[in-house]
């Protein structure tokens, strides 16, 4: 009996990339503005060629509609990520808290959506990227 393993999504890093950063489980929320400020400072200063956001970027994301609400936290987060995506490639993977992030979010921010899991080929190595919540079996 042979077991068939479905193919995983793959992303091949451009040859010029030398540094990538991985962030996960920031759980951004309006009640914790210091976390958003820390993310802003990080995004303005990182020398990374690309940034990977591996799930639970938000404590909760109820849908892309909130981006349009005046002075909304979601709108501020989206604007921050859009600015960062103009500087370097940004990638986003759903977590169990922000699985409703959708096409409108990615369109407006310029952040590319990754499947979970995705294999990243970078500097002649293969890296398995996953949020990991699907691995919690108990």
Label each residue range with its predicted role.
Residues 2-5:
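C-terminal regulatory/interaction regions
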Residues 8, 13-23, 28-122:
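Core catalytic region of metal-dependent phosphoesterases/phosphodiesterases
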Residues 130-138:
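Active-site-proximal loop/helix segment associated with metal-binding centers of metalloenzymes
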């Amino acid at each position: 009996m042979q077991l068939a393993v479905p193919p995983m999504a793959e992303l091949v890093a451009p040859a010029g990339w030398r540094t990538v950063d991985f962030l996960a489980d920031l759980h951004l929320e309006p009640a914790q503005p210091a976390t958003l400020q820390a993310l802003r400072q990080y995004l303005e200063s990182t020398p990374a060629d690309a940034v990977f956001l591996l799930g639970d970027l938000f404590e909760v994301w109820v849908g892309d509609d909130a981006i349009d609400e005046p002075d909304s936290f979601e709108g501020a987060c989206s604007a921050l990520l859009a600015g960062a995506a103009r500087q370097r490639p940004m990638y986003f993977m759903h977590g169990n808290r922000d699985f409703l992030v959708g096409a409108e979010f990615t369109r407006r921010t310029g952040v590319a959506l990754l499947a979970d899991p995705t294999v990243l080929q970078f500097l002649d190595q293969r890296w398995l990227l996953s949020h990991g919540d699907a691995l919690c079996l108990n």
